């Protein structure tokens, strides 16, 4: 009797699956039969894009060349709408688009939204623009003589369909011969020359715009760590000359941009430091004190020790590194110092918000001093955390567990934390044993 019921249920399941398969098969068959053309709904004057092919001539095998090839392929590639998921060569999405574009609601609209692929036209692919982008990429990677061309090939069986064929002639790459620094102030030039040993550009390396940008960032960081607060990487530009040294070599000259602001060419020193401590509920400071020349503004009662605030804001004076201590004594602005102060304050976890600003001491044209202002909002003093888990031990004991922890921040006014954690669990024996 039991086997009979099982057989009947199996037949019903098979029948249901067969009916669903027939519906799907019929739906696909109707699409195939009705979709006699993928171009019947094209707007006037448009040509359906069916794909592209990229041919490389003299393809470079250098590491830089391989990177260039990858980016050029990505710039030229565009998937047509005549493929499912971009790789199956059947215009399923176009068939759905042609047959269900007329539906505005109901099942037909659902099918359209789910499966239809909007046609891609040759005009929207913009092959000429893609050629320009690919050509610029060749130049960026040192292929100054490289050429990119495109040809639109119309389908001989249907004039409303066409594909695009690109030809990329990379030719020979150019390599760096020399790099000069010029037209900066004498002091700036001396700093740049002293740091040249860390340069990312060297003789014999292939020209690469990415390396040029990284070199500008390196020099900007070098200068900003030695007082040039207003200096930026985009204040420098390159001139490239391929005629000085023949045979595929380029001479580079790094120059300041025209109209470089005078402030960017001046070293700045750190002046007065002010700290504004805001309460955890947004209470504004209503009292202040001065500690070793540092003004501290706070609400009602100072919640951190002033000597610790001074140490955090002048950490370089307390390190063992002689060069860092000398830089601290010189009071030159340093981007590295600014970042380290922000990191150290963030690691304390006692402030919810921090803002460290450097502003000129006055508005005169000869001002070379920056005042420091730290504004920090205290976080809530207590942190609570509850964890729930299930543990299994090697002795077949299994059960739920929980842990509850409380952390008190800034216990002694120096960024210290005090933590209490409670653990609890209930276990029973598994694997055929009795509960315990």
Annotate each predicted stretch with a short phrase:
Residues 16, 20-28:
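Sec-dependent N-terminal signal peptides
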Residues 37-347, 353-356, 369:
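Interaction-mediating elements
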Residues 32-35:
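C-terminal motif of bacterial Sec signal peptides marking the signal peptidase cleavage site
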Residues 26, 172-174, 266-268, 377-379, ...:
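A generic structural signal for short, non-catalytic loop/turn and secondary-structure boundary residues
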Residues 188-191, 331-436:
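Gram-negative/organellar outer-membrane beta-barrel architecture
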Residues 1-3, 298, 436:
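Short intrinsically disordered, low-complexity coil segments enriched in acidic
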Residues 1-19:
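N-terminal secretory signal peptides that target proteins for export/translocation
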């Amino acid at each position: 009797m039991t086997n009979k019921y099982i057989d009947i249920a199996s037949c019903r399941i098979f029948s249901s699956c067969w009916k669903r398969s027939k519906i799907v098969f019929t739906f696909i068959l109707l699409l195939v039969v009705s979709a006699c053309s993928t171009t019947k709904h094209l707007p006037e004057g448009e040509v359906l894009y069916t794909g592209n092919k990229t041919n490389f001539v003299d393809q470079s095998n250098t590491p830089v060349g391989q990177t260039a090839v990858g980016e050029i392929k990505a710039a030229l590639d565009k998937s047509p709408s005549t493929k499912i998921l971009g790789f199956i060569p059947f215009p399923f999405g176009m068939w759905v688009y042609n047959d269900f574009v007329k539906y505005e609601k109901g099942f037909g609209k659902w099918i359209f939204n789910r499966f239809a692929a909007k046609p891609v036209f040759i005009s929207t692919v913009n092959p000429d623009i893609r050629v320009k982008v690919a050509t610029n990429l060749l130049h960026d990677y040192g292929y100054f003589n490289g050429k990119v061309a495109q040809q639109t090939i119309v389908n001989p069986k249907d004039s409303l369909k066409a594909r695009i064929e690109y030809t990329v002639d990379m030719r020979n790459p150019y390599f760096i011969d020399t790099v000069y620094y010029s037209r900066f102030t004498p002091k700036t030039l001396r700093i740049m020359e002293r740091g040249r040993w860390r340069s990312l550009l060297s003789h014999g390396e292939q020209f690469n715009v990415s390396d040029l940008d990284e070199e500008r960032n390196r020099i900007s960081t070098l200068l900003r760590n030695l007082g040039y607060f207003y200096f930026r990487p985009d204040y420098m530009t390159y001139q490239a000359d391929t005629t000085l040294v023949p045979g595929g070599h380029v001479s580079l000259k790094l120059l300041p941009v025209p109209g470089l602001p005078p402030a960017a060419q001046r070293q700045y020193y750190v002046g007065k430091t002010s700290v504004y401590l805001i309460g955890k509920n947004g209470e504004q400071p209503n009292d202040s004190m001065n500690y070793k020349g540092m003004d501290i503004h706070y609400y009602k009662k100072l919640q951190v020790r002033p000597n610790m605030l001074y140490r955090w804001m002048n950490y370089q004076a307390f390190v063992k590194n002689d060069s860092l201590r000398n830089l601290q004594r010189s009071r030159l602005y340093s981007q590295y110092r600014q970042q380290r102060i922000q990191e150290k304050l963030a690691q304390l976890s006692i402030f919810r918000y921090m803002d460290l600003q450097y502003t000129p001491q006055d508005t005169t044209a000869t001002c070379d001093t920056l005042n420091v202002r730290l504004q920090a909002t205290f976080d809530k003093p207590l942190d609570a955390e509850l964890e729930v888990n299930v543990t299994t031990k090697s002795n077949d004991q299994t059960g739920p567990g929980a842990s509850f922890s409380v952390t008190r921040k800034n216990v002694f006014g120096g960024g210290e934390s005090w933590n209490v954690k409670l653990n609890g669990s209930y276990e029973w024996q598994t694997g055929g044993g009795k509960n315990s």
